[in-house]
Amino acid sequence: MYAIQNCKRIEMKICIFGGTFDPPHIGHLLVAQTVCEEEKFDKILFMPANKPPHKKNISRVEDRLAMLNFAIEGNPNFEISDMEIKRGGISYTIDTLKDIKSSFIKEEDELSYLIGSDSLLELSQWKEPEEILNNCNVVVAIRPGFRPSDIPAWILHRIRFANIPRFEISSSNIRIRWRENKTIRYMVTLPVWEYINQNKLYA
């Protein structure tokens, strides 16, 4: 399940969807499916981070992988890669892109990287941001309140915005609602909800 061997073929359009997925929610799935259809990607590759450079106190890798597996189950266009987890340490996007391009895809394949507009605001602070733009097409899912004028011109001219619906769901809000004993049903898939409940995550 956690592999990308099926992505090996000429002129395949692959889109990496990186994140902590703590937990993966309906917004993640709707964005991924819509982008897949709108951009005509052959595969959306979910890439859970081992240790994000800007986040702390995240759930165990095993829990996040299990929830993500439940979330995408049954969708032939979705796959999971544990590349960043196996690499260990802090997960940097540029390292992942270089690893994928050198080991898993052909020169003729097209590689894209999907991020939210909230992450786009921080892209200039990521490790080797110019190299990220050189190694893939950055596709941005716009979140409410986003203003293109907040993005440096050298980045803005080298990305493209996806034509997708905007959702007000976030993993952090889900964790807060759970701790406050508020429902998160319909914000995550039922198997993910059951996993969170059974394993007492976010308590």
Regions of interest found by a model, annotated:
Residues 2-203:
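Nucleotidyltransferase catalytic core that binds NTPs
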